[in-house]
């Protein structure tokens, strides 16, 4: 089966290598992008190259579906508590309190991760930025909203689901972590 992988170019080699190793029967067809706004252009007219598409997350899939009608199955790798636990450990090792600003609007995933880590509500604080419209200024607006929460002291660090936001905040020296799917998340989705 030909599996079209639609993810940021920076993750492509690692993700494709993992899938090819774990699922040798799958023929991986890469569809890398740099910016979420490029996804429709990257996919336009190319659905016939794959039997299904696998997106890094729901946001990327949603963005593509605004301009392209799926003619093959489109799946997304779900975000999981295990991916968040990895980031909590990294943040704690760096000395950050678990006061988090995020653009991932899935509170149940955060709550599940907090419970799995044995953390109480008194030990954590979660601040969701408002959902923003997908415009040409989306990435900048998202980064600024997260940055504002850290600079105000409301949050100690950020967790983002967008690669461009991650890089923008790193350039601004704002503590930020990129929420990526774990190998287990990928495995569960492909199998």
Question: Can you describe what each PLM-predicted range is?
Answer:
Residues 1-191:
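Alpha-helical/coil-rich non-catalytic "connector" segments in signaling and regulatory proteins
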């Amino acid at each position: 089966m030909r599996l079209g992988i639609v993810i940021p170019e920076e993750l492509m080699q690692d993700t494709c290598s993992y899938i090819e190793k774990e699922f040798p029967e799958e023929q991986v067809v890469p569809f890398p992008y740099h910016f979420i706004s490029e996804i429709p252009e990257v996919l336009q007219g190319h659905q016939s190259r794959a039997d299904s598409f696998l997106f890094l997350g729901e946001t990327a899939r949603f963005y593509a579906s605004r301009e392209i009608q799926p003619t093959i199955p489109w799946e997304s790798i779900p975000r999981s508590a295990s991916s968040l636990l990895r980031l909590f450990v990294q943040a704690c090792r760096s000395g950050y309190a678990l006061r988090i600003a995020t653009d991932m609007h899935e509170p149940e995933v955060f709550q599940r991760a907090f419970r799995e880590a044995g953390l109480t509500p008194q030990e954590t604080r979660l601040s969701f930025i408002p959902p923003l419209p997908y415009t040409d200024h989306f990435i900048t607006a998202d980064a600024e909203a997260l940055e504002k929460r850290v600079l105000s002291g409301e949050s100690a660090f950020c967790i983002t689901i967008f690669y461009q936001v991650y890089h923008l905040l790193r350039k601004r020296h704002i503590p930020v972590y990129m929420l990526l799917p774990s190998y287990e998340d990928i495995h569960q989705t492909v199998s």
